[in-house]
Amino acid sequence: CPSCEKSGDCKLQAVAYQLEVKTLHFTQLFPDRPVDASHPDLVLDFNRCILCELCVRASSEVDRKNVFALSGRGITKHLIVNSESGQLADTDITAADKAANVCPVGVILHKRRGFAVPIGKRRYDEKSIREQEDHE
Protein backbone atom coordinates (compact mmCIF):
# COMPACT_ATOMS: atom_id res chain seq x y z
CA CYS A 1 0.00 0.00 0.00
CA PRO A 2 2.63 2.65 0.80
CA SER A 3 3.96 2.63 -2.78
CA CYS A 4 0.50 2.85 -4.38
CA GLU A 5 -0.61 6.29 -5.51
CA LYS A 6 -4.08 5.56 -4.09
CA SER A 7 -2.53 5.10 -0.62
CA GLY A 8 -4.31 7.27 1.94
CA ASP A 9 -7.32 7.60 -0.35
CA CYS A 10 -8.14 3.88 -0.74
CA LYS A 11 -11.27 2.51 0.92
CA LEU A 12 -9.86 -1.02 1.07
CA GLN A 13 -6.69 0.22 2.79
CA ALA A 14 -8.74 2.33 5.23
CA VAL A 15 -10.95 -0.61 6.21
CA ALA A 16 -7.93 -2.93 6.51
CA TYR A 17 -6.20 -0.48 8.85
CA GLN A 18 -9.42 0.00 10.84
CA LEU A 19 -9.62 -3.78 11.32
CA GLU A 20 -5.87 -3.92 12.09
CA VAL A 21 -5.08 -6.16 9.10
CA LYS A 22 -1.36 -5.57 8.72
CA THR A 23 -0.01 -8.78 7.15
CA LEU A 24 -1.24 -11.42 4.73
CA HIS A 25 -2.31 -14.63 6.42
CA PHE A 26 -3.01 -16.62 3.28
CA THR A 27 -1.20 -17.29 0.03
CA GLN A 28 -2.43 -15.07 -2.78
CA LEU A 29 -4.20 -17.19 -5.37
CA PHE A 30 -4.68 -14.55 -8.03
CA PRO A 31 -2.60 -14.64 -11.22
CA ASP A 32 -0.39 -11.73 -12.18
CA ARG A 33 -2.44 -9.72 -14.67
CA PRO A 34 -1.04 -7.20 -17.17
CA VAL A 35 -1.28 -3.43 -16.81
CA ASP A 36 -3.07 -1.65 -19.68
CA ALA A 37 -1.50 1.74 -20.41
CA SER A 38 -2.80 1.94 -23.98
CA HIS A 39 -5.26 4.80 -23.30
CA PRO A 40 -3.87 8.36 -23.58
CA ASP A 41 -5.38 9.47 -20.25
CA LEU A 42 -5.96 6.34 -18.14
CA VAL A 43 -4.05 3.30 -16.85
CA LEU A 44 -5.63 0.01 -15.73
CA ASP A 45 -3.85 -2.14 -13.16
CA PHE A 46 -5.98 -5.28 -13.17
CA ASN A 47 -3.99 -6.76 -10.27
CA ARG A 48 -5.65 -4.35 -7.82
CA CYS A 49 -9.24 -5.23 -8.75
CA ILE A 50 -11.44 -6.44 -5.87
CA LEU A 51 -14.37 -7.24 -8.21
CA CYS A 52 -16.68 -4.64 -6.66
CA GLU A 53 -18.27 -3.97 -10.09
CA LEU A 54 -18.51 -0.21 -9.49
CA CYS A 55 -16.76 0.59 -12.78
CA VAL A 56 -18.88 -1.98 -14.64
CA ARG A 57 -22.12 -0.48 -13.32
CA ALA A 58 -21.00 3.14 -13.80
CA SER A 59 -19.94 2.45 -17.38
CA SER A 60 -23.22 0.70 -18.15
CA GLU A 61 -25.78 2.66 -16.15
CA VAL A 62 -24.31 6.18 -15.93
CA ASP A 63 -21.96 6.60 -18.91
CA ARG A 64 -23.95 4.23 -21.19
CA LYS A 65 -20.72 2.98 -22.80
CA ASN A 66 -20.35 -0.58 -21.44
CA VAL A 67 -16.56 -0.31 -21.34
CA PHE A 68 -16.02 -2.82 -18.52
CA ALA A 69 -17.34 -6.29 -17.67
CA LEU A 70 -16.48 -9.21 -15.43
CA SER A 71 -15.46 -12.49 -17.04
CA GLY A 72 -14.95 -15.97 -15.62
CA ARG A 73 -16.31 -17.62 -12.51
CA GLY A 74 -15.00 -18.25 -9.03
CA ILE A 75 -11.28 -17.69 -8.66
CA THR A 76 -10.92 -17.06 -12.40
CA LYS A 77 -13.35 -14.11 -12.32
CA HIS A 78 -11.66 -10.91 -13.47
CA LEU A 79 -12.27 -7.46 -14.93
CA ILE A 80 -12.10 -7.12 -18.72
CA VAL A 81 -12.36 -4.28 -21.21
CA ASN A 82 -15.21 -4.60 -23.73
CA SER A 83 -13.31 -3.96 -26.94
CA GLU A 84 -12.25 -6.25 -29.74
CA SER A 85 -8.59 -6.00 -28.71
CA GLY A 86 -9.30 -5.92 -24.97
CA GLN A 87 -7.36 -2.65 -24.75
CA LEU A 88 -8.75 0.48 -23.10
CA ALA A 89 -7.51 2.66 -25.98
CA ASP A 90 -10.01 0.94 -28.28
CA THR A 91 -13.01 2.14 -26.24
CA ASP A 92 -14.72 5.52 -26.04
CA ILE A 93 -14.08 6.03 -22.31
CA THR A 94 -12.86 9.47 -21.26
CA ALA A 95 -11.14 10.63 -18.08
CA ALA A 96 -14.30 12.57 -17.18
CA ASP A 97 -16.56 9.48 -17.25
CA LYS A 98 -17.98 8.22 -13.96
CA ALA A 99 -16.46 4.78 -14.62
CA ALA A 100 -12.98 6.33 -14.77
CA ASN A 101 -13.41 7.95 -11.35
CA VAL A 102 -15.34 5.45 -9.23
CA CYS A 103 -12.71 2.78 -8.43
CA PRO A 104 -12.12 2.58 -4.66
CA VAL A 105 -8.76 0.79 -4.88
CA GLY A 106 -6.77 2.28 -7.77
CA VAL A 107 -7.41 -0.08 -10.67
CA ILE A 108 -8.28 2.88 -12.90
CA LEU A 109 -5.73 5.66 -12.55
CA HIS A 110 -5.37 8.96 -14.39
CA LYS A 111 -2.09 9.52 -16.21
CA ARG A 112 -0.07 12.68 -15.46
CA ARG A 113 -1.79 13.10 -12.08
CA GLY A 114 0.09 10.62 -9.90
CA PHE A 115 0.58 11.42 -6.23
CA ALA A 116 -1.19 14.79 -6.69
CA VAL A 117 -2.31 14.91 -3.05
CA PRO A 118 0.62 15.14 -0.60
CA ILE A 119 1.01 12.83 2.40
CA GLY A 120 -0.95 14.23 5.33
CA LYS A 121 -3.63 15.76 3.09
CA ARG A 122 -5.16 12.54 1.72
CA ARG A 123 -8.70 11.46 2.59
CA TYR A 124 -7.86 8.96 5.34
CA ASP A 125 -4.62 10.50 6.66
CA GLU A 126 -6.30 12.46 9.46
CA LYS A 127 -9.62 10.65 10.00
CA SER A 128 -10.29 6.93 9.79
CA ILE A 129 -12.97 5.58 7.50
CA ARG A 130 -15.24 5.18 10.52
CA GLU A 131 -14.86 8.89 11.35
CA GLN A 132 -15.56 10.09 7.80
CA GLU A 133 -18.90 11.84 7.39
CA ASP A 134 -19.34 10.94 3.72
CA HIS A 135 -18.37 7.27 3.72
CA GLU A 136 -20.71 4.96 1.82
Q: What do these predicted regions represent?
A:
Residues 1-102, 106-110, 114, 125-136:
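Ferredoxin-type iron-sulfur electron-transfer modules and their immediate structural context
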Residues 117-122:
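Hydrophobic targeting/anchoring helices
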